[in-house]
Structure formats: C-alpha cells, structure tokens
Amino acid sequence: MKLKMKFSAIAVALTVLITPAFADAVFTLGNNPQPNEQNVLFTSNQTGSTVFGFTNQSNTQTQFSSTTDTLVVTSNGQAKVTAMDGLVNDITFSVPGHTFLDFILNPFKPANNNDLTITVTMSDGSTSSFGPYGSTNGNNFLTITTINNEAIASVTIDSAGGFQDLRQPRVSGISGVVPEPSSLLLLGSGVLGFATVLRRKRSR
C-alpha cells in the first residue's frame, strides 16, 4: 500500500514538472512590458468586423477582428477598440503576415466578474487558454509571453457578458520587422567603427 502511494506521489510530481514544458504561452496578470514593446495606435476612424492599427515604432499593421461584434475605433485619444452595441463579446488580435512573441491586453470593465477567457493560437496551430478571469472594477491587464522558441499567431478574447472596450494593446517580437531608424543608425556606427579599426591594423 505504501509503495503504491509512493508511485502515485512520484507520478503527480512528474506531471507537475512536465506540464509547463508543453505550455508554449505564458500568462502573467498585470502590465509587464517586454523588450522593444510597441503601442498599437489607430490613425483613422473605423467601423466594421475588422479594423486596423499600426505599431508606434516600426509602423507595422495590426488587425482586430470579431465574429460577433461591429468594432469601432477612433484616431483621437487613448488607443482602444469598442463595439457598436457598447459591449465587446469577441475580439481577435493578429499581425497580418507576421507572428509575435508578446502581447499585453486590457479588456476594460467587463459586465460580469470572471467572464474573460483568452485563447492564444501559436504559429504551429496549437492553442493555449487562460481564464475565466476579470473584474468589473476596471483594468484587467494580462501579459502573454512565449517559451520553447514558439511564436504567437493570434490572441482571442471572449466574454459572454461583454466588456466595455479593449484598451492600451501592446505587442513585441514581431517577426521580420526591420529595426527602427535609431537602432539602424547605432548599428551602422558600430560597423563603421569596426571597419576603421581593421583599416588601422592593416596599415600597420
């Protein structure tokens, strides 16, 4: 009997240790910016099942779509996505033609507590979920990152009762994005300096 209990305890311990290795998306409550985090901004007023924004540094196009709502965005003030009927029930974020490594979301003021479910679709087609969670009081920041060299294809937020808006979306690690001009300038300066050192060594 004792031997059987020991084997059971070992099996449970192994399960706990192994499970995280298959969880390619990591969910952390709160607003936890990652390296090279970019804000998503809207440059025009839009209405539809799909609306588009742009990152504030690389100017990469991003997409917000819904299977249930008519989405509404404005180009003025804080970046946020609302719904025509006043409550967002379903919204998916993606970066057309790219994957990404991190996404920060804030489904603001859901109608009901613990009514937010997040589904992350990875680049290999697998999915990871988080929730239900959320408070009716206001902010519901969630930071999504990745492990195991995985990348994110899209992030979906579902809420049966709906939430007021999705605000302050941020993204980082977009695949194939060229560094911003200031980064390129620093890189160019470094290459130029390295070439100068080589030239001096050769002249000796």
Annotate the PLM regions.
Residues 18-24:
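Sec/Tat signal peptide C-region and signal peptidase I cleavage site
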Residues 24-176:
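Surface-exposed, well-ordered secondary-structure segments
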Residues 10-17:
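Bacterial N-terminal signal peptides
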Residues 179-198:
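A short, hydrophobic C-terminal helix/tail in secreted or cell-surface proteins
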Residues 1-10:
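Bacterial N-terminal signal peptides that target proteins for export
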Residues 201-204:
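Short, charged juxtamembrane terminal tails flanking transmembrane helices
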Residues 22, 37, 181-183:
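Intrinsically disordered, low-complexity segments enriched in proline/serine/threonine
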